């Protein structure tokens, strides 16, 4: 499979490029970045000290024309622009971008009617195993336990709560028959009164170079259960994304997530 990488000069983009170059069965076909990026025109493997013959470009049409699939961990507005071109050219996409609003998510769903799309807030195998653990725990602890989700990321992350934290909330809410949109609490300040027993709380930490920490707490009387996942490197995200791209090889269309990719459904 021929893979192109969006956000090629960013931290995640570089990790994805390195992973594609080191993975059998896939080839690097393109490297995309925004107009004006300092890396435009450079070889995509320059940061590795390795010539690839692929120049970083801002021409989405040219980049996608040479590829079978685009892996995109950028920002919602950029991803949606790339998606429109991918849909028109019939190219698949693996999307790890977070922070989409309802209209953005609908655009992804609409595109998936004609191209294969893997969309997941977190591509890590470990995080997706954690989702399954949370589903089991939530069903067992649905009564008498308060549910709180705490997440921490580096100072540069622009959306909050993280997409992974929200996905964890969705898993828990679905398991206990609640609607996250109705029961989520994202901020507490001042005199808040007693905690609503049916709420799912979120707390966000931003600082330093934290790659990604997530903990779901089930707090009861006399005991507390915590299920945590801590990332020390973006490598797990990159490995999962490339695995997702390979999964799409025989999928002409459809919306998938990492649970599909990993066979956990």
UniProtKB/Swiss-Prot annotation:
Q: Where does the UniProt entry say this protein principally localizes?
A: cytoplasm
- Tell whether Iron is among the UniProt keywords: no
Tell me yes or no: is Oxidoreductase among this UniProt entry's keywords: yes
Q: Where does this polypeptide localize?
A: Cytoplasm
Q: What is the lineage of its organism?
A: Bacteria, Pseudomonadati, Pseudomonadota, Betaproteobacteria, Burkholderiales
Cellular component (GO) terms are: cytosol
Q: Which InterPro entries match?
A: DapB_C, DapB_N, DapB_N_CS, DHDPR_bac, NAD(P)-bd_dom_sf
- Task performed by this protein: Catalyzes the conversion of 4-hydroxy-tetrahydrodipicolinate (HTPA) to tetrahydrodipicolinate.
Q: What is this protein called?
A: 4-hydroxy-tetrahydrodipicolinate reductase
């Amino acid at each position: 499979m021929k893979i192109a990488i969006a956000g090629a000069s960013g931290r995640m983009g570089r990790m994805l490029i390195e992973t594609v170059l080191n993975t059998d069965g896939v080839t690097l076909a393109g490297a995309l970045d925004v107009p004006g990026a300092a890396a435009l025109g450079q070889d995509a493997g320059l940061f590795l000290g390795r010539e690839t013959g692929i120049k970083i470009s801002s021409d989405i049409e040219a980049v996608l024309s040479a590829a079978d699939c685009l892996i995109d961990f950028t920002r919602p507005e950029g991803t949606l622009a790339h998606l429109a071109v991918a849909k028109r050219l019939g190219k698949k996409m693996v999307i790890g971008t977070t922070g989409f609003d309802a209209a953005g998510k609908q655009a992804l769903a609409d595109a998936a009617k004609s191209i294969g799309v893997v969309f997941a807030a977190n591509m890590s195998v470990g995080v997706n195993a954690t989702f399954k653990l949370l589903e089991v725990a939530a069903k067992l602890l649905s009564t008498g336990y308060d549910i709180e989700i705490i997440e921490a990321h580096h100072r540069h992350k622009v959306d909050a709560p993280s997409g992974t934290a929200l996905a964890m909330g969705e898993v828990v809410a679905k398991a206990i028959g609640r609607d996250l949109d109705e029961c989520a609490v994202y901020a507490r300040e001042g005199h808040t009164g007693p905690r609503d027993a049916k709420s799912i709380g979120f707390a966000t930490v931003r600082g330093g170079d934290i790659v990604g920490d997530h903990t779901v707490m089930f707090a009861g009387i006399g005991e507390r259960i915590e299920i945590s996942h801590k990332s020390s490197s973006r490598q797990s995200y990159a490995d999962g994304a490339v695995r997702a791209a390979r999964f799409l090889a025989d999928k002409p269309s459809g919306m998938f997530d990492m649970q599909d990719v990993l066979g956990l459904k």
